[in-house]
């Protein structure tokens, strides 16, 4: 009864096992000959193995950085470093951890970190070793915690970004009498206030605080360090500049050439630095001397083995093998011999004396800036030397050891007081020396950033941090004078911090004269005094291997950098002066790590990274800081976009497995700079590689190209059909749409965080080039999105730079200059020519649709159309503008969609002469043959798209997903070719799935396409005639020209009315909306037109609308005469194919699209009230005409919403046929089998009577209670036979019942025998979960009210009220989501667990603990209960249940999809009568529970306890 909780398949487990075996061999070969091997991996957290396997990290490591309290049991016999995330966030008061030494003389070092939030304490992760327990508790403000000897950890609810560090270093010997317990404590909070910890903790706190700009240097406490063989490896900056406050691992000391096993995971999103350290104790070295290698320095990270250390992306794993590595903090390497040496009290005294001498020797050196963390290796040899925990705390031996420890502490206390006094003197000296050093700083050499002389600095820093936190081990018996001393230290720290704050303010005043724009940004920044962003110079920028890969692209930027070199150096000088203000002893490194990604140029390009891609973790780590650093609607919009972006990675499985990231920190999982600066959440930072933003800033080519500039790719390892594949994802640069100079000062004012002067100059220079090259829309975005202001923090700063929304956005005062004038001609041309632009335009303009994440084709074929461009989700792509407008709020395309009408009233576009020049394929630019699947393509791309969709092929790209697709190389990358097909607007639903030829000549979709194609050609001819006339009439005004053009087009359609009524309505509706889109594109979001222009546009639109309504009335009469009425039509006819009751059916759109369209509609109504001038009678007839003739809003989206302003909201986006083609409301649940709109046999609507008959047949054959329950359950429980025999009987019963049910189904004869067997094999657990949940939802309330049971057991039996109890609680509305703390949910889960406990105790014949039960089936019971409650709240009906059951049975079976579609139509027809107000919403609500049912069913399979549903149902009726 053990629940396997690993999220991986058997193949993954096998590879995991192989990884562990390899590690075991390597570690055993490196360890001593004690015979110890690696701990049993089933009892240890997988995070504790280093170097971490990518597969290994998902299961256990996600808890390390959650805001919740997650005690991780650390199995101590691990001969390697214990890597856990470390954090040193910004302003904080150190809430030190309280360590209680248990009586067995073994103490595991516990480090606790405080998390983000205003004064929040973080998660404490306790390390429990083989010996006694260690208790740590983090403290919130003004709350004192007492230490206990049990494993405990408390966390603050506000610490959502906290990362916890746990490092165990037990130091004890079997006969040691004077062991100073080693404990490591480093706690820090990330808040904007000064204090986050409680200062008044009696005998449990060591006070180490800092003010708002200096973070606490509360480093690590460990056993007294040896003074012998102390080596210091100074920082060796290569190329000069710091490389980001990353985490580094040093291999030094007595480690003789072995590869370092120290791995530091720095996964947190803090405000200014990501410092962390790790250390590795070498296995038993041959020398008897202990060695301590301390490495400190500025965060220049130059690993020699090629492993990058990066903190800015939120995650870094660095493994170094050379002592040349330098870290942001400090890493101490201690050998195991040192620990053995410390176990003897006489040697302890020697160490104390040596340490005193060494401290006095280096007392004059300056203190280092950054606090570090120490992670000490726990080896089996040290575990062996520890005594076992005592049986009783009151035993005599433990009391004697305690007394001996007290005597040691008394001796150490005097030394500590002297060291504290020395330390205070050192601080004063360091302040004065650092102030003197400020005047000597020069700007250009970045190597001078390492503070002072490095050699003695390192050693003294190490002892300074030890002395700072040394009283932590003595606080249990320390006198009150110790606390007075600590408070005086704290007061001194605050004074120093205030002094630093003052100096920093003076420095910024000096900057204000020379850099007013930068000062202006700092005034807007909430943390302007904290963040100092250091931009590396030109020499540093080219050290990245990504530059070596893309060196041709760098030549443009080298010229650009040379022009700005002097200004950069001046900026460097001031920034370095600011930097040295913050290198005081209590100040952390406040440099911006996202811009300092210096790497070793010799390393390989592809290095295995491990990322925790759990999205709830990303949201928890990011959103509090988002709400903290920006206010109001900007933060809310940015948060919404951030949450929306991360949806597809919530349970992300790229082509089959959870992703592993290679070569990049998976920037598309973490929102960076979500456009909050302009008040709109639609601009997303396109940089896919935030950790190397200094390198990706160079990757934007200045020349026009077919594809956007390639950023540093993020490679995701995936698995498809057992084959390892790579998915190269990148985030698209949103089009800047040719911004002018007037926009940049505004963006600079609104950017809340530091954009350096250099980047502002790059923006302005970039905007000049964008004005010169008007067709290049996504030009400089990689440069504008670089200043992610904090390492991994989700900030709503407009670090997107030039990528602001210039139309279609949500709010944000944008000037009229933000409308791109060069896009208007192109937009109008796109509108009239259905996306067929000029050849030269297509070659110079990158397509705006780039899916922000890798296109997951498996999920696409499974029905997840959320990856498609928004235009595909709205209509049949009848105009190209609808895609751009519809996506302006989601993909940052406002510059294209919004700028479409700004110049139309001033300078009309010249019609194209496409009939004279050949059509060009929109995919590969080959000669096109016509309109295929929605766009103009060649035969090759048409066939490629058709075969891909019909065969559901899954492609992968070996590059970064942006391969150029041309005629010459279109066959090189199928993934990018198909992706471009989707982006350009080819419609998946238009592909015939039955593989029948003759698609052009039959079917509604193809009729529609033929009409569209004819309209396209005739419109071009008419435009040419008009162009010839207009060239002769140049004196006419531009507004009159627009009106004449519309009038002439309408006259043309009136002439064609009798010949082609259907064509007339398509064309007329399209052109009328085109007129309104020309006149009203910018009225609602930004009032960019003058009042006179608005009035004129409204008048023209109203006239066109009135004329359109008259034509509709005439057309209705003609339709009635020609066709003999509406109701008698054949269903397969395109136009009036709908019955009267279906005329009121809403289109099938997702709620998000409906909401977006309603908002746009309301905005247009408010902006132009002239649009709704028609009478109610005309409005009603227009609605009917829209249903019958399919002309309204084929463009869809907000652009056409003005024309349909008088329509009901559910009809805004067009007709039922068109929405049935895209059917976005069922996207998540239905597979990609929407040929119901293509095949005429599936177009027929099922009548309500017929649907009721089919549903009743299902109800008659459905033995719900027989399947859901066990007959004679009481006898079953009391049966004394073998448990295995009982379970076999249950299994046989399941099989028999399901086979009997399927044989009664009306479509049983249509199912082949092998498919029938496969169905039962694959779907039995899903059907069982659905039946269980529906049974309890349908029958539980009746039993709960009656109180009795069917088998006569009394109502007082506890087993008879599990479903009746929660019904007394108030039931929320069905729309309300079910939370884990919902009283009904909690009550029902507890009732189910108690029922299971009772029944299983009876069944097994032995008591079963509730904890064990929760561990085994708790998660599954939660899921089942959640489904039950949701079914109960939405008042599930029996008719809906049987349809859902058939749907689940037939789901994902290609051969049976026609049957499945038939019953979906049956359910839809039933819902149109049972829920006439909103049947589609009801259908979506029902289908939305299918993924939850599948998840619960998978848990049921994993637990192997398939009898749980039977037990619950049977016990509830017993």
Curated annotation (Swiss-Prot):
The keyword Magnesium does not apply. SMART domains: HOLI (SM00430), ZnF_C4 (SM00399). It comes from the Eukaryota. Residues 1250-1518 form the NR LBD domain. Residues 918-993 bind DNA. Residues 34-46, 430-451, 475-489 have a biased composition (Polar residues). InterPro entries: NHR-like_dom_sf, Nucl_hrmn_rcpt_lig-bd, Nuclear_hormone_rcpt_NR3, Nuclear_hrmn_rcpt, Znf_hrmn_rcpt, Znf_NHR/GATA. GO terms for cellular component: chromatin; cytoplasm; nucleus. It is found in: Nucleus. Disruption phenotype: Flies exhibit larvae that precociously leave the food to form premature prepupae, resulting in abbreviated larval development that translates directly into smaller and lighter animals. Residues 400-429 have a biased composition (Basic and acidic residues). Residues 30-50, 145-327, 380-587, 672-820, 887-913, 1015-1101, 1142-1210, 1341-1371 are annotated as: Disordered. GO terms for biological process: cellular response to hypoxia; negative regulation of ecdysone receptor signaling pathway; positive regulation of multicellular organism growth; regulation of developmental growth; regulation of pupariation; regulation of transcription by RNA polymerase II. Residues 1061-1077 have a biased composition (Basic residues). Pfam families: Hormone_recep (PF00104), zf-C4 (PF00105). A zinc finger (NR C4-type) spans 921-941, 957-976. Residues 145-189, 208-219, 291-323, 490-529, 546-586, 681-705, 738-799, 1021-1060, 1078-1101, 1144-1193, 1351-1368 have a biased composition (Low complexity). Residues 238-260, 800-812, 892-902, 1194-1205 have a biased composition (Gly residues). Keywords: DNA-binding, Metal-binding, Nucleus, Receptor, Transcription, Transcription regulation, Zinc, Zinc-finger. Belongs to the nuclear hormone receptor family. NR1 subfamily. This is Hormone receptor 4. It comes from Drosophila melanogaster (Fruit fly).
